[in-house]
Design a protein with these regions (language model features):
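Extended, helix-rich architectural segments
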Residues: 1-121
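Structured, contiguous alpha/beta core segments that scaffold functional sites
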Residues: 7-10, 98-197
Length: 197
């Protein structure tokens, strides 16, 4: 996935990037994902069986990390509202998402506003690629990926976030492919119902 993303983003001079993740790290995250999902490449179900240890270990670490976890948002006039949303929507299910983060090597919480309030998208390490950092190590640009299959087609959305001063510029691009080896042809984001909002 990393190579396909890099190739697509570097086709256009407006989006030239140097992905801040090595292909080796991307391969490791893919391996950790496969191991967690009980699809490790060395398991053949006949001679080599899985003990499902990656999922068990990630679950136990997440349990220990969140067992007595207390967290809240304080300060400012909007803190009470934000804390209420945070308690209901983030902390309520935090153990499950910490488990995914432990299993795959990372997790990003991406809040956004909906008609009914705040919502949180939990982006796992295999769907997030940092593109640029500042001198203090803060992410300045990244790409989030979302992918799904419908029939024989694979749809992919790249959501590039670029920090520009105090604002974030978000660019969405959509692609459709018939194989796992490339992102395929670029299509309008509005051509896909779930992304047309």
């Amino acid at each position: 996935m990393l190579a396909a993303i890099t190739q697509v983003l570097n086709q256009n001079s407006d989006t030239q990037v140097d992905v801040c993740m090595t292909s080796e790290m991307a391969r490791r995250i893919e391996l950790w994902t496969a191991m967690y999902e009980d699809n490790a490449p060395w398991v053949d179900r006949k001679k080599v069986k899985s003990a499902q240890l990656p999922a068990a270990i990630a679950s136990e670490v997440a349990r220990l990390v969140t067992l007595e976890m207390k967290s809240e948002i304080t300060g400012g006039s909007s803190a009470a509202y934000l804390n209420d949303q945070y308690q209901k929507k983030v902390l309520k299910n935090i153990r499950r998402y910490v488990e995914y983060g432990c299993a795959k090597g990372g997790l990003i919480l991406k809040p956004y506003v909906t008609k009914t309030g705040l919502a949180i998208q939990y982006v796992q390490a295999d769907c997030f690629f940092p593109l640029a950092f500042d001198d203090s190590g803060q992410i300045q640009q990244c790409v989030f990926t979302e992918q799904f299959r419908k029939g024989q087609k694979i749809y992919t959305r790249l959501e590039v976030h670029t920090l520009q001063g105090e604002q974030i510029r978000i660019t969405n691009r959509a692609f459709v492919a018939t194989n796992d080896y490339s992102l395929g042809s670029e299509i309008s984001v509005n051509a896909v119902d779930r992304w047309s909002e």
